[in-house]
Regions:
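Pyridoxal 5′-phosphate
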Residues: 3-304
Length: 304
C-alpha cells in the first residue's frame, strides 16, 4: 500500500466513520497534492471543509495560526513531516501535541522524511503515518500505513475483495481483523520483499549516518548556491533536509533543468505536485536538487 493509497484510505474511511457535513480537516499550505486531493474529494462528497496552516517566507509553518484553526468541528489534522519542495522539517511532535489537546488525531505524511532520518512514531505520537517504498530505495507501488488500533478498529474497509473477509454470504459479509480488513485482494509480495530489502539496507548503513551526510550536503549546497548572482532559494529554515529548490534570475525553471540535464546533472523542475507552494511564492515552478545517501560534495560542486 503506497503512500497515496494510504492517505486515500484514511481520508475515505475516517470520514465515513467520524465526519459529517460542516466538519473540518486541517492541512498545511506545503502539502503534496496526495495530501490535499483525497481530502478535497471527501469535502465535495460530504460537505466538509479544509483549513490551511500558512507559512512564512522561509517556509516555516505559522504555529500560532495553526492553533487558532481548531474549532469544535475539527476532526483530523493531516500534515507533511518534511516538505518535498522546501525541505522544511515540520515540528510534528508539537503539531500532534496541540491536536491531541483538542482531542483531534493526526496523520503524518512521512514520504519525504523516512528516507532521510530515523522515525519513531511512538515518540511523535501520531495516529497515522504513511510513506512510500520508492523514496527509500524500494520498488514503486508499495509503501506503509501505520495507524493506532483505537482508530483503525473503528474505521470501515476502504475497498472490497478477497482476503479481507471473514465470511461472505448474499445476506451479509463480515471482515477480518486488522490489518487484513484493509488489504483486499492478493498483495504484491514481490514488492513487499523489495521494500523489506531496502529497509534492511538503510538500517544497516544507519539512519543517523545517512542523516548526517545528507544534512552536510544540504548545508553545503545552500551556501554555494547563495554565492550566485540572481539566485533565489526557496525553503531557508534551519535544519532543512535533503532538498534545495531555486530559481536563477529570469531563467525559466524548465530551461534551467534542460541545461543541467545536458551537463549530466539530474534535477527536477515544475511545481513538484505542490501547486499551492508555487502560488504562495508567486511562481509557476522551481528547480529542485535533492540528495540521497549516494551523493557527494563533488556533485554539489558540479551543480554550482
Amino acid at each position: 500500500m503506497y503512500k497515496r493509497q494510504s492517505i486515500n484510505l484514511v481520508a475515505a474511511s475516517f470520514c465515513e466513520a467520524f465526519m459529517a457535513e460542516g466538519d473540518e480537516v486541517i492541512v498545511s499550505v506545503m502539502e503534496h497534492h496526495s495530501n490535499i486531493v483525497p481530502w478535497q474529494l471527501q469535502a465535495a462528497k460530504r460537505g466538509i471543509a479544509l483549513k490551511v496552516i500558512p507559512m512564512d517566507d522561509s517556509g516555516k509553518l505559522d504555529m500560532q495560526a495553526y492553533e487558532q484553526l481548531f474549532s469544535e468541528r475539527t476532526k483530523i489534522v493531516s500534515v507533511a513531516h518534511v516538505s518535498n519542495t522546501l525541505g522544511t522539517v515540520n515540528p510534528v511532535k508539537e503539531i500532534v501535541r496541540i491536536a491531541h489537546e483538542h482531542g483531534v488525531p493526526v496523520l503524518v505524511d512521512g514520504a519525504q522524511s523516512t528516507p532521510h532520518f530515523a522515525i519513531d512514531v511512538q515518540s511523535i505520537d501520531c495516529d497515522f503515518f504513511a510513506f512510500s517504498g520508492h523514496k527509500i530505495y524500494g520498488p514503486t507501488g508499495i509503501g506503509v500505513l501505520y495507524g493506532k488500533e483505537e482508530w483503525l478498529d473503528r474505521m470501515p474497509p476502504y475497498q472490497g475483495g478477497g482476503e479481507m473477509i471473514e465470511s461472505v454470504s448474499f445476506e451479509k459479509t463480515t471482515f477480518e481483523k486488522l490489518p487484513f480488513k484493509f488489504e483486499a485482494g492478493t498483495p504484491d509480495y514481490v514488492a513487499t520483499h523489495g521494500l523489506a530489502t531496502a529497509l534492511n539496507y538503510v538500517s544497516a548503513l544507519g539512519m543517523d549516518n545517512i542523516a548526517a551526510h545528507e544534512r552536510e550536503l544540504t548545508d553545503y549546497c545552500m551556501k554555494r548556491l547563495a554565492e550566485i548572482d540572481g539566485m533565489r532559494l526557496f525553503g531557508t529554515t534551519e535544519g532543512k533536509d535533503a532538498v534545495v529548490s531555486f530559481l536563477v534570475g529570469d531563467i525559466h525553471h524548465l530551461d534551467m533543468g534542460t541545461l543541467l540535464d545536458r551537463l549530466g546533472i539530474a534535477v527536477r523542475t515544475g511545481h513538484h505536485c505542490a501547486q499551492p507552494v508555487m502560488d504562495r511564492f508567486g511562481i509557476q515552478g522551481m528547480v529542485r536538487a535533492s540528495f540521497g545517501l549516494y551523493n557527494t560534495k563533488e556533485e554539489v560542486d558540479a551543480l554550482v
